[in-house]
Swiss-Prot record:
<dbReference type="GO" id="GO:0001525">
    <property type="term" value="P:angiogenesis"/>
</dbReference>
<keyword id="KW-0964">Secreted</keyword>
<keyword id="KW-0325">Glycoprotein</keyword>
<feature type="glycosylation site" description="N-linked (GlcNAc...) asparagine">
    <location>
        <position position="182"/>
    </location>
</feature>
<dbReference type="GO" id="GO:0072546">
    <property type="term" value="C:EMC complex"/>
</dbReference>
<dbReference type="GO" id="GO:0005576">
    <property type="term" value="C:extracellular region"/>
</dbReference>
<keyword id="KW-1133">Transmembrane helix</keyword>
<dbReference type="Pfam" id="PF21203">
    <property type="entry name" value="ECM10"/>
</dbReference>
<dbReference type="GO" id="GO:0016020">
    <property type="term" value="C:membrane"/>
</dbReference>
<comment type="similarity">
    <text>Belongs to the EMC10 family.</text>
</comment>
<dbReference type="GO" id="GO:0045050">
    <property type="term" value="P:protein insertion into ER membrane by stop-transfer membrane-anchor sequence"/>
</dbReference>
<feature type="topological domain" description="Cytoplasmic">
    <location>
        <begin position="243"/>
        <end position="262"/>
    </location>
</feature>
<keyword id="KW-0812">Transmembrane</keyword>
<feature type="topological domain" description="Lumenal">
    <location>
        <begin position="26"/>
        <end position="221"/>
    </location>
</feature>
<feature type="signal peptide">
    <location>
        <begin position="1"/>
        <end position="25"/>
    </location>
</feature>
<keyword id="KW-0732">Signal</keyword>
<keyword id="KW-0991">Intellectual disability</keyword>
């Protein structure tokens, strides 16, 4: 009997270990997958742990046309709301072109797909974009801030870029200061606008109606409440203000009789 009980216990433990093993493997795989993808997302969706990738592109052309190329990759953890960015270094040709665009007062543009994880423009549902004067980016030594605005569905609805410090003052910038971007990223979640106090108003109205139903006496008019006091007062005033017609008639008759005796 004891041997059978021990065998059943061992079998139960083996079953529990078999059930727990896949869940541990899934958890470790989620963490490992996130670390392995990292900066290599290239706009692809990180399937595990609620992390998605966004491709960051930029454009700066002499003729001010839009010709977007990859600048880096954004990694958005939708569970904790964190945003990270990995960027590549500008080539010598790109640094020279950026200087030329800045000298011509041209624009530096950035864009991000609206739908995280999209592979192309059609799947992305379009792009959101922003721009700054190229000269301000050059004089800031490629120091800028990107802010992503997202909605409740997890789509990107806007992006803004600002340089630190901003403005174009004509300062000389060495070529070594235009190799690496110094970028801070910020995620702007949706804000809930205050709605009308419809529920509170309805609740207050129902409470008032319930209170009136409990005290129907309060719904009566002033006359309905105090008629038993008002009617006697009105009758008293009517009786006290009426002329004494009987007394006046008796006096007139006596005077007439005296005159006829003479």
């Amino acid at each position: 009997m004891a041997a059978a009980s021990a065998g059943a216990t061992r079998l139960l433990l083996l079953l529990l270990m078999a059930v727990a093993a896949p869940s541990r493997a899934r958890g470790s795989g989620c963490r490992a997958g996130t670390g392995a993808r990292g900066a290599g997302a290239e706009g692809r969706e990180g399937e595990a742990c609620g992390t998605v990738g966004l491709l960051l592109e930029h454009s700066f052309e002499i003729d001010d046309s839009a010709n977007f190329r990859k600048r880096g990759s954004l990694l958005w953890n939708q569970q904790d709301g964190t945003l990270s960015l990995s960027q590549r270094q500008l080539s010598e040709e790109e640094r020279g072109r950026l200087r030329d665009v800045a000298a011509l007062n041209g624009l530096y543009r950035v864009r991000i797909p609206r739908r995280p994880g999209a592979l192309d423009g059609l799947e992305a549902g379009g792009y959101v974009s922003s721009f700054v004067p190229a000269c301000s980016l050059v004089e800031s030594h490629l120091s800028d801030q990107l802010t992503l605005h997202v909605d409740v569905a997890g789509n990107v609805v806007g992006v803004s870029v600002v340089t630190h410090p901003g403005g174009c003052r004509g300062h000389e910038v060495e070529d070594v200061d235009l190799e690496l971007f110094n970028t801070s990223v910020q995620l702007q979640p949706p804000t809930t606008a205050p709605g009308p106090e419809t529920a509170a108003f309805i609740e207050r109205l129902e409470m008032e109606q319930a209170q009136k139903a409990k005290n129907p006496q309060e719904q009566k008019s002033f006359f309905a409440k105090y008629w038993m006091y008002i009617i006697p007062v009105v009758l008293f005033l009517m009786m006290s203000g009426a002329p004494d017609t009987g007394g006046q008639g008796g006096g007139g008759g006596g005077g007439g009789g005296g005159g006829s005796g003479r």
